[in-house]
């Protein structure tokens, strides 16, 4: 292109940008008002919407230019690490679209709260002994700065999984332990069992992630002095202990002779009631088991709060919201309450928050619940962003690993993300008929590379495990694929869908956030937290 044509092209673009107005949501024109020189905004054809892409790009560049990174060591008073368990990039994309569609928009233009954070990188998730990782090894990397083996909780790769005798000298110090030693307040929140792999790695050390209660310990572990994960939470003796613990997993904290408020028995064989011990070992302590007692919790007069809201994992957020399961707080509510308790400490705090059930829904092949739990995580991050300042709080959002969850086909703009694929015709007009495979059968936009496969259930996501894996394709013409009970088809039939090995995103803001850049090893996350809050030096000085 010669200089004259280039000038004319730029003039045309800039002139076009000055004419017309964009659609109501500023991106797609499908619900827009007519532009001065545009069409009526139907089918995404409003030329003013095209102009808005250019304007939005300019605005984004201007915003990025105005950022002044704070890379001073120790500048972060507080750290909040959010982990979407199993929240790969395809899950983020699909949840973004679903949230937008639930708001009445086409969806693609939507952004989850954490997608607005200014700094972004990718993390390589493999474990020392695994190309595709598990949550124990990945979370250990994030909270200790050291990669380890599959199934191992905050211990180095020198251990043999499941062997207590191999653990001597292998414990790794976690960011939560460093914070407590430095005098900061600490908290762990999860919608999974609080003794499950991801939250456990913040405070416990074990060669086997499944040692959640003492009844899970093999004889060798007992003989060699290993403790179960729940007991380690109570025995956490750094600083003033953990200040806030909220999630599921009550059964690991109460004796097997005790029945909890849900009518379910505990799992402890040693007779210890760790909930009672929590109340006795801390002053200004509280223990809550349902949403009512949680909401009544007085944060001003509570320094140590233990909330165990389910015998096992907490409910999926879809079920909590739509199916009358009202006895549990949301992830956003737990996050807000935790911050209110922790920020009373003038030295600052470290809080780790996990959306644990994204992973579980994917394992069951139930995309709807996985995406709703991702949206719930977005709401929790939004609350944290509102309650903290980017000037003194490093806030990061990431995943421990991905899943074999795909977004496929050529669906038209705004096609229901959980629906059957409907494409555009040769003229770019959306078709009224479903796209079909080589055998003439319709297919969904989202699906899985492996797993249990198709099922259309009226019950919860985990009920899929009561049925055998479905091999091959099924005719979906008369199936409501947008129902929360629909379980997507899978290419390779397995008893459970697997994790995936691709990189996961890291979103960040606040002091040290600009150190999240490029593609990094997952253990880099710890080192950013340590640099931003100067945890090691503060902990060392406090001893």
PLM-predicted stretches and their roles:
Residues 1-7:
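Bacterial N-terminal signal peptides that target proteins for export
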Residues 15-18:
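C-terminal motif of bacterial Sec signal peptides marking the signal peptidase cleavage site
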Residues 20-47:
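Collagen/collagen-like triple-helix recognition
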Residues 38-74, 112:
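Short coil-to-helix leader/linker segments, especially the first N-terminal amphipathic alpha-helix
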Residues 52, 76-77, 87-92, 97-140, ...:
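A post-motif C-terminal structural segment
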Residues 74-102, 168-183, 190-193:
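Active-site-adjacent structural elements in enzyme catalytic domains
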Residues 143-145, 177-183, 387:
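Alpha-helix C-terminal capping segments
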Residues 154-169:
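His/Cys-centered metal/cofactor-coordination and adjacent catalytic loops
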């Amino acid at each position: 292109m010669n200089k004259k044509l280039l000038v004319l092209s730029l003039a045309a673009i800039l002139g076009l940008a000055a004419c017309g107005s964009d659609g109501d949501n500023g991106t797609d024109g499908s619900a827009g008002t007519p532009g001065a020189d545009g069409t009526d905004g139907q089918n995404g054809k409003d030329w003013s919407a095209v102009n808005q892409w250019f304007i939005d790009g300019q605005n984004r560049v201007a915003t990025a230019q105005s950022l002044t990174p704070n890379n001073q060591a120790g500048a972060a008073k507080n750290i909040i690490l959010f982990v979407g368990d199993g929240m790969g990039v395809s899950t983020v994309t699909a949840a973004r679209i679903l949230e937008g569609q639930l708001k009445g928009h086409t969806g693609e233009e939507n952004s989850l709260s954490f997608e607005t954070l200014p700094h972004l990188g990718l993390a390589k998730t493999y474990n020392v002994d695994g190309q595709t990782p598990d949550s124990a090894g990945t979370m250990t990397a994030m909270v200790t700065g050291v990669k380890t083996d599959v199934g191992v909780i905050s211990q180095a790769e020198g251990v043999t999984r499941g062997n207590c005798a191999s653990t001597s000298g292998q414990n790794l110090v976690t960011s939560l332990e460093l914070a407590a030693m430095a005098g900061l307040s600490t908290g762990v929140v999860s919608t999974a069992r609080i003794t499950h792999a991801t939250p456990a790695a913040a405070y416990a050390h074990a060669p086997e992630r499944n040692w959640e209660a003492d009844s899970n310990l093999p004889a060798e572990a007992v003989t060699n002095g290993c403790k179960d994960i729940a007991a380690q939470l109570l025995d956490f003796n750094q600083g003033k202990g953990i200040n806030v613990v909220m999630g599921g997993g009550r059964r690991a904290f109460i004796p097997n002779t005790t029945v909890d408020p849900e009518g379910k028995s505990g799992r402890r064989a040693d007779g210890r009631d760790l909930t009672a011990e929590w109340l006795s070992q801390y002053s200004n302590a509280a223990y809550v088991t349902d949403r009512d007692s949680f909401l009544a919790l007085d944060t001003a007069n509570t320094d140590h709060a233990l909330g165990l809201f389910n015998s096992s994992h907490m409910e999926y957020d879809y079920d909590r919201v739509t199916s009358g399961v009202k006895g549990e707080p949301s992830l956003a509510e737990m996050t807000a309450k935790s911050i209110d308790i922790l920020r009373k400490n003038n030295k600052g705090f470290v809080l780790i928050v996990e959306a644990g059930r994204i992973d579980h829904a994917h394992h069951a092949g139930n995309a709807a619940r996985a995406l709703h739990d991702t949206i719930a995580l977005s709401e929790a991050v939004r609350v944290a962003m509102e309650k903290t300042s980017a000037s003194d709080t490093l806030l990061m959002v990431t995943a421990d690993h991905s899943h074999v969850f795909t977004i496929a086909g050529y669906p038209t703009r705004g096609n229901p993300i959980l629906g059957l694929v409907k494409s555009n015709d040769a003229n770019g007009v959306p078709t009224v008929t479903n796209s079909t495979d080589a055998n003439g059968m319709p297919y969904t936009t989202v699906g899985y590379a492996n797993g249990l496969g198709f099922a259309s259930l009226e019950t919860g996501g985990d009920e899929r495990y009561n049925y055998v894996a479905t091999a091959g394709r099924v005719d979906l013409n008369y199936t409501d694929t947008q129902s929360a009970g629909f379980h997507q088809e899978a290419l390779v039939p397995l008893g459970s869908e697997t994790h995936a090995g691709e990189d996961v995103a890291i979103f960040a803001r606040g002091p040290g956030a600009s150190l999240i850049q490029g593609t990094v090893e997952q253990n880099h996350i710890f080192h950013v937290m340590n640099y931003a809050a100067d945890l090691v030096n503060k902990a060392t000085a406090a001893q």
